[in-house]
């Protein structure tokens, strides 16, 4: 960690090296980079004709779709929990 409170590290995503920095732990940054790398490789393996830019955009769209689905599921579960908490009598 540097004096500015950020962790810095170099990661490999789809064969390219990137220098990343952030306040998250080094392990978290590596996990995120690995997730992006895995997604790009998954898309690339499905269609070998796509260039890197298209693979990156399709990966971003897939990741955003997954994020929005999970966020919607989270909000639905939170609503259920809140409704159950309201219905539960206070002792």
Segments (PLM) and residue ranges:
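Extended beta-strand/beta-hairpin segments
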Residues: 1-31, 75-91
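Amphipathic, hydrophobic secondary-structure cores in small proteins
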Residues: 15-62
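Long, leucine- and charge-enriched amphipathic alpha-helices
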Residues: 49, 53-91
């Amino acid at each position: 960690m540097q004096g500015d409170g950020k962790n810095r590290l170099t990661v490999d995503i789809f064969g390219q090296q990137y220098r990343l920095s952030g306040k998250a732990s080094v392990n978290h940054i590596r996990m995120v980079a690995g997730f992006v790398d895995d997604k790009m490789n998954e898309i690339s393996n499905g269609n070998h004709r796509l260039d890197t830019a298209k693979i990156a955009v399709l990966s971003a769209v897939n990741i955003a779709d997954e994020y929005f689905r999970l966020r919607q599921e989270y909000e639905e579960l939170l609503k259920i929990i809140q409704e159950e908490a309201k219905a539960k009598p206070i002792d």
